[in-house]
A protein has these predicted regions:
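Basic- and hydrophobic-enriched, low-structure N-terminal and domain-boundary segments
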Residues: 1-83, 87-90, 135
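P-loop NTPase motor domains
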Residues: 58, 66-363, 378, 399, ...
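Conserved ATP-driven motor cores of ASCE-family P-loop NTPases powering translocation/secretion/packaging/pilus
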Residues: 355-409
Length: 409
């Protein structure tokens, strides 16, 4: 009997202190995923998927497995020139016709190839912003999407981010002073001008009417008189407060600020651009309500007018996020897929924050780049944050070092 008890204690002790070994897995268990791994993310209805490869796709609906629902639909696409980013990713996803689309279209070839299919087969409304041939563009008026002082600040931020020199140093003062003047003028137009004058043509006319004289501190330009009149009526008016801050500079400095501001807005002063921005046809607020395909045709050679698409994207996200919360209590009824081909062509301010929150509003973004270094060059330290907000990365090939490191880690 004693031998039996001793044997039992020996077996019990060994089991209690036994180490768990996974034989054959001494160097890790990482492996390539297979059909069973991707299956929970795929919708049985092929048309309700986001396409990645011939065998991999993601459902636009809710993932069946609750433990896997932390996956978002943001995609980072990396591929060198000629790797098929447009042919094998942008176009196939457009032809799924399962969402509203916002598609950047360098050279304007994508809308030519899929536009009629979207209209006839998907019953889409087509919207086109053409910054290569303004006469072929629909009208876009940023003033149409201003509803508050915050919107005014956001509009000025995107203008400054895409029209000012990227050099550092003494530029900060001039940028801040230029921003104050733009905020004051835009606020005055938004709150005080009649509806037909709420556009960039009026902003340019007011800027051209601004004047200061170095030897005469008491000189009043027509714009000064407008703000003086408004200050007497509403001293706490947002436009008055911003203009007062701008006017605190000395005469010579004011003149330099006016020159800086005029230089920043010079691309708007072309008659074709003035005409295109006279009124609005884009209906950005409806992208999440019904099926609309918006194509932004931008030059991949001359970046002069790329700020127009950046301005539109920035306002679109603000409008859609507000509408999702205020009208639909969280999520838009129609998914909005943003296909940003050649994403480095323009800069969207605060993008590192926007890309992290749009998922909850039923919006997704496909950030398409030739190299990862393009993202780092544009967004600096925020590049990793932006990449981290994309649950999926699609690599189509390339030799650039930062892209290869991104894929291998």
């Amino acid at each position: 009997m004693c031998c039996g008890v001793l044997l039992w204690l020996t077996v019990y002790y060994r089991k209690k202190n036994a180490k768990k070994f996974r034989h054959g897995a001494e160097y890790g268990t990482a492996r390539w995923g297979g059909p069973k791994d991707i299956a929970p993310f795929i919708n049985a209805d092929f048309s309700q998927n986001l396409l990645l490869t011939d065998t991999e796709r993601l459902t636009l609906g809710q993932i069946a497995d609750p433990e896997k629902r932390n996956v978002n639909l943001n995609v980072l696409v990396l591929g060198g020139s000629g790797s098929g980013k447009t042919r094998y990713h942008i176009k196939p996803n457009l032809l799924q016709m399962n969402a509203s689309y916002v598609c950047s279209d360098p050279k304007g070839t994508v809308v030519e190839e899929v536009g009629q299919v979207l209209i006839k087969k998907g019953h889409y409304k087509l919207k086109i912003l053409n910054t290569i041939d303004f006469s072929a563009s629909m009208h876009y008026n940023p003033f149409h999407y201003l509803h508050s002082e915050t919107d005014i600040l956001s509009l000025v931020t995107v203008i400054m981010a895409n029209t000012q020199s990227k050099e550092k140093g003494g530029d900060d003062f001039w940028q801040q002073a230029t921003a104050l003047l733009l905020q004051a003028l835009i606020a005055y137009i938004y709150y005080e001008a009649p509806e037909e004058e709420k556009n960039f043509a009026m902003l340019l006319d007011m800027l051209n009417a601004c004047e200061c004289r170095e030897g005469d501190e008491n000189f009043k330009s027509p714009v000064d008189l407008l703000f003086d009149k408004l200050a007497k009526r509403e001293p706490d008016h947002f436009a008055v407060k911003q203009y007062t801050k701008f006017r605190q500079a000395a005469g010579k400095t004011l003149k330099s600020i006016l020159i800086s501001c005029s230089a920043a807005l010079a691309p708007f002063d072309i008659q074709e651009v003035r005409d295109m921005m006279a009124y609005d046809e884009m209906e950005l607020e409806k992208l999440g309500d019904e099926k609309i395909a918006l194509f932004c045709i931008v030059s991949d050679v001359d970046p002069t007018f790329n700020f127009l698409s950046a301005m539109l994207y920035s306002q679109m996200f603000n409008v859609l996020c507000d509408r999702a919360l205020k009208v639909y209590h969280g999520r838009l009824p129609v998914h909005v897929t943003c296909l940003f081909d050649e994403f480095a062509n323009q800069k969207i301010p605060n993008w590192e924050h926007l890309v992290s929150v749009i998922r909850s509003r039923n919006i997704s973004a496909h950030i398409v780049l030739q190299t990862y270094s393009q993202l780092k060059g544009m967004y600096k330290d925020n590049a990793e944050t932006i990449a981290g907000c994309c649950s999926t990365m699609l690599f189509l090939g390339g030799k650039e070092e930062s892209s290869l490191k991104m894929v291998s880690t």
